[in-house]
Amino acid sequence: MRITNVIWLPDIVDKLAWKHRVATIEVEHVLAHPTRFKFAELGRHHGEDVYVVFGQTEAGRYLAVWFIYKFNQEALILSAREMDGKERNSYGKK
């Protein structure tokens, strides 16, 4: 999966900062150096589905990032947070 650009909505940036303590630069690093993409659900528009990517930031945090993969290869960020225990264990077994 090739991502050419990341789309940030102001409300999402705010939510990531106050609720999940995740910075935009961390999300962009995970998307630029993905370990595993996983289909999450069908999107509202045909061909624009929701995916989750699991990866590690430069600082060593393990993040799960949800995004809509757009037709033009852009990623519209929906959410991001630290991986939970089950995700972290699965990530370690890649």
Model segments located where?
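Ribonuclease/tRNase effector modules and their secretory precursors
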Residues: 1-94
